[in-house]
Every structure is written in structure tokens, then in C-alpha cells.
Amino acid sequence: MHTAIIAGITTFILTIIGIPAFIRFYQKARISGQQMHEDVKQHQAKAGTPTMGGTVFLLASIVASFVIALFSGNLSSNVTTILFILFLYGLVGFLDDFLKVFRRINEGLNPKQKLFLQLVGGVVFYLFFERHGGGDMLNVFGFPLELGFLYIFFVLFWLVGFSNAVNLTDGIDGLASISVVISLGAYAVIALEQKRFDLLIVIFSMIGGLLGFFGFNHKPAKIFMGDVGSLALGGMLAALSIALHQEWTLLLIGIVYVFETASVMLQVTYFKMTGGKRIFRMTPVHHHFELGGFSGRGKAWSEWKVDFLFWGIGLVASLITLAILYL
């Protein structure tokens, strides 16, 4: 446990040192920064804010986790597998951000390119996971289900789905970073109960990095994590649930990401079926609350108010999950 705490503190320090340096690099290089294409007026002031901050906490977490796990004798196949997915999905996000920021390609990677790279990363993760005894048993609400060769399709769906879900959640200052901290906190408890001290190192390391990043990402944000951060974090959560053989728990622990994704899917489907009508003022659904509270027609909510609502939902859902598992 103390090794995991050291990993968290190390990544926290590396992040709070690295982020200011990264911001200065942005400013000196006169990089355009984040572009805003949303219809939320209060977001227009954020145009030009440095992005790709996820690069800092991601690299800090990967390096700190690897080195500390290595020297503490905890560099297991589980650790390398999680670090592997962090790197692969972070790389996909980095390419997407790089095209947007440095090449001025507004779309970045197109959806097909991004999906292809995510699927490739998922296949590599599956092969690595299976090679090290991962198995093909799916935990469905506490009941084991043998999937056989179909397990790879579940893994791909889980990794791609949740990486994109966290990406959708990263739409207002601080929302994704603390939401993921809460989710990782729940998985830290599960890992501790399973005596998976190797995974605790990676979990605590990322928590430390995100807490350090939040100091610069809360409203008003000085930097955004970008796709490099959000895609990697979503992939990590999915990979953790698989490595801990508690896949179903991510539906509750990650309820915020599920809610955000479902809102987009419902909005698009309803819009097409009704010829232009909407369920929400704007999706992902955190923008609906920004524009007009619960009803979408009331007084606009501040980002802090939306943040605390969603963090609260995530925290309660995580506590319920842990209660189901251990009480």
C-alpha cells in the first residue's frame, strides 16, 4: 500500500511541475490552442486555451508506475497491460490532438481512422491479456459467463466504448478529471480487497496525476487534457474492470460516462425520427444543464454546479457498487 501512495505522490509532483512548463511551451510557440465550436456562450472565452495537458499526467503516470513497480517487485503482467493500454489509447488521442492543434485540421482524425486505431489497440490489449492468463470469462453482475472466442468482441466494445465515453464527458472544466478520480478510487478499493497491490500502484499513480492536473484544469481552466488524456483514461478504466474481473461494475462506477454517451445517442436518434426535435437542449448532457438546469428551460447553471452534480452522481454510484460487492 505504501508503494502505491509513493507512486501517487510522485506523479502528483511530476504533474504540478510539468503542466506549467507545458503551458509556457504553448505560449512561447504561439500555438493556437483549443478551438470552440459549441453553442454555449460562456465557452467562447476559452478559445485559445492550451490543450493536450493529458500528455503530461499520462507520461508522468506511466513512467512513475513502471519504475516504482519495477523496483518494488510489482511489475506484473497486469501492470504492463494497463500501462500498455494507457500508452496506446493516449497515442491515438495524441495524434488526434496533434492534427487539430499543430496541423490546424479541425476534425483531427476522422471517426473511421480513430475507430480503427482504437480497435487495433483493443486487439493488442486482448492478445496481451490472453497471453498472460486473462481468460475469457465475463463477470455479469456476479455470475460468470464463458464467452470463448466471443470475449474479444466484448473487450473491443468495452475499451472503445468507455474511451469515447470519457472523451464525451471532458466538456467542461474539471468534470472528467475528478469523475475519473472517483472511479479510480472505487477500483482502488476493489484492487485492495483482491490484494492486487500491483494494480494499486497504477491506480494511485493516475489519481495523483489527475489531482495535480485538476489544480490547473478547474474553472477557469488554464489547460485542457485533450483527447490524449480522455481517451487514455477511458481505456484505463475499461482495462481495469477487465483485469479485476469486475467488468459489470463499470456500468455503475462509470455511470456518468454512460449517461453522457446515452444522451448523445438518444438525441441523435430522436432528432432523426422526429425530423429535427430534441430531447435535450444540447448534448453531451452536461451542456443541457449548463444552458438551463434540470429542465433545460430554467436559469443557466455554472460549470461548478454541473461539476458537483455529476461528481456527486459518480460518487454515490461508486459507493453503491462497493456496498453491493462487500456488504
Swiss-Prot record:
Keywords: Cell cycle, Cell division, Cell membrane, Cell shape, Cell wall biogenesis/degradation, Magnesium, Membrane, Metal-binding, Peptidoglycan synthesis, Transferase, Transmembrane, Transmembrane helix. The chain crosses the membrane at residues 3-23, 51-71, 79-99, 115-135, 140-160, 172-192, 197-217, 223-243, 248-268, 306-326. Its cofactor is Mg(2+). It catalyses: UDP-N-acetyl-alpha-D-muramoyl-L-alanyl-gamma-D-glutamyl-L-lysyl-D-alanyl-D-alanine + di-trans,octa-cis-undecaprenyl phosphate = Mur2Ac(oyl-L-Ala-gamma-D-Glu-L-Lys-D-Ala-D-Ala)-di-trans,octa-cis-undecaprenyl diphosphate + UMP. Its EC number is 2.7.8.13. GO terms for biological process: cell division; cell wall organization; peptidoglycan biosynthetic process; regulation of cell shape. GO terms for cellular component: plasma membrane. The keyword Magnesium applies. Pathway: Cell wall biogenesis; peptidoglycan biosynthesis. Coiled coil: none annotated. InterPro entries: Glycosyl_transferase_4, PNAcMuramoyl-5peptid_Trfase, PNAcMuramoyl-5peptid_Trfase_CS. It is found in: Cell membrane. It is an enzyme of class 2 (transferase). Pfam families: Glycos_transf_4, MraY_sig1. The keyword Repeat does not apply. GO terms for molecular function: metal ion binding; phospho-N-acetylmuramoyl-pentapeptide-transferase activity. It is a multi-pass membrane protein. It comes from the Bacteria. Disulfide bonds: none annotated. Catalyzes the initial step of the lipid cycle reactions in the biosynthesis of the cell wall peptidoglycan: transfers peptidoglycan precursor phospho-MurNAc-pentapeptide from UDP-MurNAc-pentapeptide onto the lipid carrier undecaprenyl phosphate, yielding undecaprenyl-pyrophosphoryl-MurNAc-pentapeptide, known as lipid I. PANTHER family: PHOSPHO-N-ACETYLMURAMOYL-PENTAPEPTIDE-TRANSFERASE, PHOSPHO-N-ACETYLMURAMOYL-PENTAPEPTIDE-TRANSFERASE HOMOLOG. Belongs to the glycosyltransferase 4 family. MraY subfamily. This is Phospho-N-acetylmuramoyl-pentapeptide-transferase. It comes from Streptococcus gordonii (strain Challis / ATCC 35105 / BCRC 15272 / CH1 / DL1 / V288). The gene is mraY.
